[in-house]
Amino acid sequence: MSFQPGNLPAVGTGALPPQITRNWLYQKACKIRGLFALPFRKQKTPFFCRFSFLYPSVQRRILPTSGKENKMKKRNIRKTAAALTALALCAGVLTGCGGAASSTASSVAASSATSSEASSADADELAAQNVADLIDAIYVQQRTDDTDAQCEAAKAAWDALTDAQKELVEGENADPDYFGRDTGDASKDDARNADEIGENELLVVSFGTSFNDSRATDIKGIEDALQAAYPDWSVRRAFTAQIIINHVQARDGEKIDNMQQALDRAVANGVKNLIVQPTHLMHGAEYDEMNEMLDQYRDKFESVAVAEPLLGEVGADATVINADKEAVAKAVTAAAVKESGYESAAAAAADKTAFVFMGHGTSHTAKVSYSQMQTTMQTLGYDNVFIGTVEGEPEETACENVIEAVKAAGYTKVILRPLMVVAGDHANNDMAGSDDDSWLSQFTASGAFDSIDCQIAGLGEIEDIQNLYVAHTKAAIDSLNG
């Protein structure tokens, strides 16, 4: 039926109240249809977000996401069905023109009820959109004077939503998982942002993660090991990803210093000797940017030293390996073998099982570190260990290339595990997620393997890795003593 005024049936004499004209009915139908119309929303970029000038190289999404497109499709279906119902009710009113007044009154009542439901649905959308806007406002890579208040406002607005309204939260970067996804107990973590530092500070600088359990076991695990090893130094924390700092603060009320805040705190507390221990994997872009920020504060301390990242010096090409990379290769392989139930990597190989360790990847010249890790694995005799990266840089570490390499080697079982300090978003989503582009899904879709299992564990929880950071810190402290 075409909803145009000229196509509506004539109003029967005395059958409807005089105000129920063809134009009135048409306007009501359009109003109901408009209330249910789904406004176009720009689809957010799946893996990237905008960041400030402070850390321009940080390009990956950090926040947990899962099944968002399916949720939007379901909402579209519900709204389409509701709109069709509303229009059908209006059609019922129209076809009743000229009939009994009681029948018309019932139709008008039904239309009014539907309009009321539409208004309620519209109110839900507005409430959800308000929260989405508040989340988008703090989903940034820089801190402002308004950040604390914005974090509180976003959480308060989220808490005020009903469960149904929470499912409707969609913004440029916002989704229900921002506040709604359970990533563990934040109280197990320690922000390490207290004053009364003393003269000696050991500042542990990490990218960060919004996954509470991983933050406590991986990052805090390293910090605790360093504090135990060096009781005369006060261990403090700094994250370089403001997007994560804001997320944790808004959702859990935990305030973590960014690099600038941590250095300002050190200066205000009269710190004289500063050791900076990055938990970064390599001498990459984040390591460089950390040093650029530190350079602005070096003259405010009597002595400053920066410890090596986990993998140590980069080296000239893929054939150059060092003791740090060898130690990491042994530690992560041993942990993976133990968790999988094998006695050794060789025993796993005999059972046609391959281990795939997924790193982040980078366009920085330090990307050769991943190739060096593959060389290290081969040198150690771990022929069933393969190194890959989310970003696919270096090229041979891209998922499709790793799949082909594992297939060509004849392995029929695969165990995926992150080659990352923290088992956060990348491990849970990019590696083990249910989306088609996750590594688990891609390995499964290849049809080449009998089984694919995932181990969600960061390097930071491995004791031998913690000890390697302790050794790097010792070298930095020794450098201050000449």
What is the meaning of each model-derived region?
Residues 102-121:
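Intrinsically disordered, low-complexity serine/threonine-rich repeat tracts
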Residues 42-71:
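Short, Lys/Arg-enriched N-terminal segments with co-localized hydrophobic residues
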Residues 71-84:
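Bacterial Sec-dependent N-terminal signal peptides
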Residues 123-125, 173-415, 420-482:
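Extended amphipathic ligand-handling, pore-lining, and cofactor/metal-binding catalytic surfaces
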